[in-house]
């Protein structure tokens, strides 16, 4: 059983600054980290490895220079995967969902897999598209919002997901792509032994050419900016008579 768990390196939101001049975001001081939602996918994959005999877990990511960071690689491997594959190329530096999914699908095909796990979304964009797009590109079943994995056999995965007013149980034929929600588990903090052992695990570094990737982005991002801040008007209306109520209503109309 070959399980691939996908993850994305995202900027640490605590260190993102806003340029006052134009509202653009400054990522220069923001270190990269594993997207919080993908930590759940990594944990789920490693829990399955404990249940399935001879299962192997491969962590997979596509991106830019953030994936060259040795500390980041060790962080991923210390959480349980047996090996790591990173696809590094400048074109993936700010990749959007369609491009990311196409690259992940190509890399997964090259690596081989029975099951692909990923987070429901990413901490930066949270587009909630990549998992389903990977399934569409590979022409295999894809399910999102999975909150519990019930069982795994050689050819079927049984899962649950919480809908608005019911719990849905699904049997999914393998190979398949499953996007998990944060309700599925609580990611463990790696032990010192796991952190030290991560340095001995294999890492494969591929380029876009290595996976035969030559797709162009369907659309391009023009700008990312923080919402413009409006100054508070600080209007105080004293009294509770009809005139004050009318003034209050008039001011509400101006801002709605």
From Swiss-Prot:
It comes from the Bacteria. Keywords: Electron transport, Transport. PROSITE patterns: ETF_BETA. Pathway: Amine and polyamine metabolism; carnitine metabolism. Transmembrane segments: none annotated. GO terms for molecular function: electron transfer activity. Coiled coil: none annotated. One of its GO terms (biological process) is carnitine metabolic process. Heterodimer of FixA and FixB. Required for anaerobic carnitine reduction. May bring reductant to CaiA. Belongs to the ETF beta-subunit/FixA family. PANTHER family: ELECTRON TRANSFER FLAVOPROTEIN BETA-SUBUNIT, PROTEIN FIXA. This is Protein FixA. It comes from Escherichia coli (strain K12). The lineage of its organism: Bacteria, Pseudomonadati, Pseudomonadota, Gammaproteobacteria, Enterobacterales.
């Amino acid at each position: 059983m070959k399980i691939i768990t996908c993850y994305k390196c995202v900027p640490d939101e605590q260190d993102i600054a806003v340029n006052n001049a134009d509202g653009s975001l400054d990522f220069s001081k923001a270190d990269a980290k594993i997207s919080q939602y993908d930590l759940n996918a990594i944990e789920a994959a490693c829990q399955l490895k404990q249940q399935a005999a001879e299962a192997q877990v491969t962590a997979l990511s596509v991106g830019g220079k953030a994936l060259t960071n040795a500390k980041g690689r060790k962080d991923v491997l210390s959480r349980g995967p047996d090996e790591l594959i990173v696809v590094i190329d400048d074109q993936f530096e700010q990749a959007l969902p369609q491009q990311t999914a196409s690259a992940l699908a190509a890399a997964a095909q090259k690596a081989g897999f029975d099951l692909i796990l990923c987070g429901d979304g990413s901490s930066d964009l949270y587009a909630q598209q990549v998992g389903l797009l990977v399934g569409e590109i590979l022409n295999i079943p894809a399910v999102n919002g999975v909150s519990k994995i019930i069982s795994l056999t050689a050819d079927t995965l049984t899962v649950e997901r919480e809908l608005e007013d019911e719990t849905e149980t699904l049997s999914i034929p393998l190979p398949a792509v499953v996007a998990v929600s944060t309700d599925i588990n609580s990611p463990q903090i790696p032990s010192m032994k796991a952190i030290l052992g991560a340095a001995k695990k294999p890492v494969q570094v591929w380029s876009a050419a290595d996976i035969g990737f030559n797709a162009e982005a369907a659309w391009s991002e023009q700008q990312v900016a923080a919402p413009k801040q409006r100054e508070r008007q600080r209007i105080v209306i004293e009294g509770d008579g009809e005139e004050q109520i009318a003034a209050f209503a008039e001011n509400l109309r101006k801002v709605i």
